[in-house]
Amino acid sequence: MKIAYDAKRAFHNSRGLGTYSREVIRLMNAYFPDNDYYLFNPKRKNAIELAPGANNTILYPESLWHRKFPALWRTFGISRELQKLKADVYHGLSQELPARIQKTGVKSVVTMHDAIFMRYPHLYPKVYRKIFIEKNKYACMVADKIIAISLQTKKDIVHYFQADENKIEIVYQGCSNIFRQQINEEEKVRVREKYSLPQQYLLNVGAVEKRKNIELIIKALHHGKINIPLVVVGKATAYMQELKQLLTQFGLEGSVIFIQDAATTDLPAIYTLAEIFIYPSVFEGFGIPVLEALCTATPVIAATGSCLEESGGPSSLYVDPYDVAAMSAAINIILADGHLQIKMKADGLKYAEKFSDENIANNLMRVYKNLLP
């Protein structure tokens, strides 16, 4: 089978959509090595190196015009390339499909991650929203099959983009295998020293932006007089400055450690060393950091109201994303109960097996095969 992918995010996004895209490509190579995989990459420069795949062919814009304007190539050039390749399936990994793909004879799949920009329009520039709405509606309309990464996402794309429910398959995403590997004591010591991590800490990992609601954790620390520091792993943003102002307001300047340059390979140890992973995001399409925490046997507190119960499972604790007292109580409950911590770790590891590489790879291949004669 010839399977082609929009690999822009795989090569140029370090987290989020990039992580998802790289994992799909890795899993297909690992579990179905007899297929040919074609990866459309709009830019050669500063590309992330993917896991080796013997049957991967990377395709770039060829004409001067498309090299100068790679976005035009993604939108209007890829369909012609697919016809030349005589591809069987094209999978848009980040909510987009190229124009006129329905006229190529190539079966198309699109992964829809979320509709957050519809729920929270004030968080996104107006021009960005308009473009993305059109791209999303088009992809849902012309795709032969739509993959939703959670039940919540399925509900949202039906509601906001009028997607045909009969075309939608829920295929959960996983996380990198590095989070499933045992971390030895030497590695823990190395990482703790590298980032000057305290002996005990709470943890948040991901984009440092308003929607992630990290302020709830800070307010909970103040409300509950919790003396364990919080470590926030994520790149510097304007929202980070808001958080620092809040810390000053509460007199908690030394209670939060910001790590802006953590290596991906160090993240498993950073998770493992934490007492609790806290993810109070007001809305997510899936929430990969929650799964990463489960895979490293770290107890999880997450927010209600979106899909995080799907990614975190029954062993995690959930609180209203605006309830400071509830968050404070949840943190204290886990910290005070060693038996609960042990149970959350064991049950979390078991639940994470649902998102194993093999399950995800087989579910994706089932979607592809069901499109073909």
Outline where the language-model segments fall.
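Carbohydrate transferase catalytic cores enriched for Leloir-type hexosyltransferases
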Residues: 1-373
